[in-house]
Each structure stands twice: as structure tokens, then as C-alpha cells.
């Protein structure tokens, strides 16, 4: 056994001079202490959205230890086949790593399987068995947040901060419950506290003053309040501190959002163009940042302009060096974006044609990947999207058939949020048929922070004679200053309901 490689098992304990608090991380197994340093560096990049830098550090770590399980799991290659290969290699190392690492791998696998009950069970194990580690409570808080169990999530994340006041991700998630940030799960409108969000933003700046991400998040607070001038210098600081990093384009995009909602659409689109140019050699980032340029046309009620931009992106996809699987994904997404625009612009034939293209590309992608999770998601998506388009064009009986199939698929998932989409669409269908009682019942069983469906919930409340609550919902939507396809569609409609458009 003399020639067997020495395995370094790290349980990091850092003594903080200011507070004398022992900060304990979860154990990570690797044959190389240098690989571990690179892994920790990668996770710092992960925290602030620098994906290329994260993968570069993990490449170096894996060169030193090719069987570094957590590095393989966290690599997250943009190539789906390589990503699956890394995940399978990490699983094969299960008998060489600690039980805590096995639980972390199982949490992430549970997300992929749509089994949020299993994710919760494994996160609770970490807390029960590594109660001294802030990371145990962070994992639990993330899972609880994604399950929309926000009170429990807040408690867990605060317990993580008690164990490590410099936990960047803890403060970021807590802030995101109050201030919009990407796909972060938020508290209901009446429980959001912008001042508290500001405090978390200040903590993020204290913890990572070296990077532009916390300045961007603090600026979001002012944007949420409609104080666009106060947000500008913070967005500029974010751009300055992200120069040369893979997230620099993101800094320009969010600055563009601030100009758009502040009424300067010309400067906003200039910022979007700058962002897109910065990532021209990164096909996935190029595709994603182009979406915000598309959304700017929808916000301006220019669906034809949005469709033109989508078409401009679409014709370039084959030349952008995507891998085979991701190319099909992006073609399906481009078709979906067209479908949304056509459907909400009452262009029926074009909407159904775009829907058909999305379904075709998704099925081909699933066939090539031969991954059970992707196959399930594609089947679910086909029923959801078809039901949605059928509802928008008044084909309610057809939509109900799609919804029954969707319900059957989603009920198989162990996830308290699995039926949110079903209830949102069912609520729309009942509303359009004039049954506001069943509509409200479904909306109330869905995601109470889903802005698109909340617009229709407002219409249902109005139909039921509850003008006060309807107006409250329309006001919440009308003052939302963040960019996504769903907000872009219903924000102007909500203003119209309030007599502001």
C-alpha cells in the first residue's frame, strides 16, 4: 500500500480574527491540495456568475486530480453530453468520498430528477450530521427556497450566517426573496422589504468588494423602487469591476434594463448591443443576451420588431459553433420565443407553426440524449405549450385535454411546485370560459408570485367584483422594473387595466 496515493480530506476551519468564530465547511475529498485550492477558487467565481472562470479553475483542478468528484459535479459544461459524462464519473467515485459529499451529489441529482422531496431529505441529513458547518444550512436553505418554503428557507439561511457571517450566497438568496434577481424565488409582494434587501446588498458589497456582482445587486434595489438615477452609478461600478470577466456582458445588460425602465430605450438597446458584442465568441452567452434585446421590443409593444430580432438570431445559429445537442435546444427556444410573440399578437397560423417547430426540435434533442429526465421534461413541455396556445386562441376543450396529460406527468414528480404551471393554465382556461370561481381556485393553488398568471388572476378577481384586490395585482405588475418575457407581455396590459396606458 506504500504506493497508494495520499488522499487529502479537507474540513476547513478558518479562525476569523474579528469575531473569533470558527467557520466550518463541509468535507471535500481530493488527492491534491492544489486541486482543492483551485476548486475553492472556482466556487468564488461560481458565486458571482463567472462561468468561464469557474470552469477554467476546475479544468486545472481536474488536471491534477481527474477523479475529483465535486469538481466533476460542479463543472457544468455547456455541452450536455460532457455534462452528463462528468456527473456519471462523479457518481462512480461514491465509495471514495465522504457521506457528506454523497449527499451533496444526491441533492443535485434530485434536482435533475425533479424529486425535490429527496433533495430536502439529503439536505436535512447534512444539517443533522454536520450541524457545525454553515454549508449544511446553506444547502438546506437553497432547497427550501426552491420548494417555495420560504419561511423555512429564511430560518436556515440565517442559521448559516450565524456560522459564517461572510457567506456570500446566503446573503444573496435572502436578498433575492425581496429584490428580483434572475430566477430567484421571491416572497409575495406584501412581504417584500426593499430596505431589508438593501441591507443584504450592503453585506454582499462588504463580503465581495473585489467584484462587480454585489454592486449590480444593490443597484437592483433602486431599480425596484423606480429610482433609476440612484441605480446608475452602482451599475457603472459593476461594469468597471467586471472588465475582462465573462460576466461583463451581464453588467451591461442589467444597466440597459435600468435605462429601459427609466424611459431611455435608445441607450438601453445600445447597452444590450455592447453586451452582445462582448460575448460574440461564446455562443450560449450570445444567445441568452440577445433575448433581452428581444424583450425590449415586447416591452415597447412591438411584437414584429421582437420577431425580427428572433429571426436574426435564428439564422445565425448554425454558424455559432454549438454542439449538436445545444444547437437543437437553442433552435427550440428560438421557436418558442416566436410562438410567444405570434400568439400574443394574435397571429394564429404562425403561432401553431412555431409551436410545432419547438416540439420537433425538443423531441430530436431528447432522442439523441437518451436521458430519462430530458424525455420527461420534453413530454411535459409539449402538453404545457400546446395547452397555452390553445387557450390563447379560444380552443378550450383541446386545451383541457392537454392539461389532463400535463397533470398526469407532473403528478409523478415529488415536488411541491410541480403543479404550479398546470394550475396557472387551468386558471386561464376557466377565466376565458367565464368561470371566475374555478379560475381563482386554480390560481390560488399555483405560484402566487408568477407575474404572467397573476395578470389573469387580476382579471378573474375583477370579473368576481373584487376590484380592490384586482387593482392591487395590476399595480404590482405595473411597477415591476425587471426584464423577462412574462413581465414584458403583461406589464403594459396591467397599466392598461389601471388606465395608465
Task: Indicate residue ranges for each PLM-predicted region.
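Alpha-helical segment of the N-proximal tetratricopeptide repeat
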Residues: 31-60, 64, 102-125, 129-132, ...
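Residue-level recognition of tetratricopeptide repeat
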Residues: 34, 68, 99, 133, ...
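TPR alpha-solenoid repeat register
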Residues: 71, 136, 170, 214, ...
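Canonical tetratricopeptide repeat
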Residues: 74, 139, 173-174, 217, ...
